[in-house]
Amino acid sequence: MSKPAAAASHDGVNRAKPYQLMLFPLNNGATNVYFVLILSYVAQFGSSILKLGMFASIMVTVMRIADAVTDPIIGALMDRTSTRIGKFRPFMILGSAVMAISVIILYCLLPLIPESMMALRYISFTLVYFIWVLGYTFQTSCTRAGQTVLTNDPSQRPLFTIFNTIGSLLGMGVMQFMIPLVKAGFDVKDEAGVLISSGYANPELYRIITPIGIAISVLLTALAIIGIAEKDRPEYYGIGGKDQKKVKFSEYAQILKENKPMQRLMVAGAGCKLALAIATNTTVLLALYGIVMGNYNSLYLPMMVLGYVFAVPFFLLSVRTSQKKGQKASLTRYVSIALICYVGVLALLLFSQNGNPARMLSFPFEGGSGINLYTILFILCFGIGYGAYYATADMPIPMVADCSDYETYRSGKYIPGIMGTMFSLVDKLVSSLAQTLVAFIFLL
């Protein structure tokens, strides 16, 4: 064993340096940029710009059938990869490059195909989106699998949630904040200020947000590569740098069948991701703030900031709970709080009544008489619910590394790649399912 490995595992624990804990989670922020750029807007883009109707929404879900084949193959390939720059960094670099090129083609070049060649639009959209999905799998799988080499210290892994959230704010948060601002500049209104055409129907919007999103993602990817560089070496592959048994393709199904913790984690992670995908869906937010509350441009950003403010104390509480009682206990506790509060939000929305000031949101800056009891209750339920949920939304990610470590202890096999891609598969399935669910709900 090399000196670095020996130093890291002299007491049986592989610990990460502070800068490694802070930088590597930015890989998730890098992919979350595309989560917003693609999964939140591709359906609207396909419908309003490419004129594909519901095809884009349905294709996002249907294509997951192919993922059931490609994801395990990518995971198995990762488990067998060992290059001069490590096991994980090649997939991070390749994934980032593939996604960047795919998004440029999708948002900037496909609209140039004339409407007289609609068949080519359908084929090109399907092909480009499929290639983008492969790149997304390459990079997202590293977020899960790479933690096995970064640290196996139970007191350090929960910290991933905090640093991951910082990365998400630098990626997903910036995109969620920036895109509506850019979109507002492309809104077409009449002299009375009534919206005639949404900025989301203007192809120029996508040509502006594409290079911005790519630049943010590439920067976060580069920082994440720096974070894992020292640990992406053979002596850190597995528990304590032990030699690992080779795994045959035929063995993967049996391994996953016997790894009960991983099965339960995939179910929990699917629920968290589905809730996030629906709650942050563009169509849902437009309906909530624009139709139900009547002022999307004035309410969207303040409510988003409110949620982040409430999330701060929950991040600290969830990490503390994870370190004391384990990540499972922390996830269960704070998701339960979020569920109760969101039920309260639903009840308040059902109770609201247009024309009745006591049963509507009222803010002084919107011409209201002041903040009423209904508004206070809504802010508390929404803020606490969003804060508790957001603090645990990515908690299943470090738990994938725990499941991989469990498999190494159980069978002696080190397969972080297949663990990461299986979780990524579920992640993409439910994210895409959210698009289809939202589309069908609004059709009813």
Region annotations inferred by a language model:
Residues 2-444:
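Membrane-embedded alpha-helical bundles of multi-pass transporters/translocases
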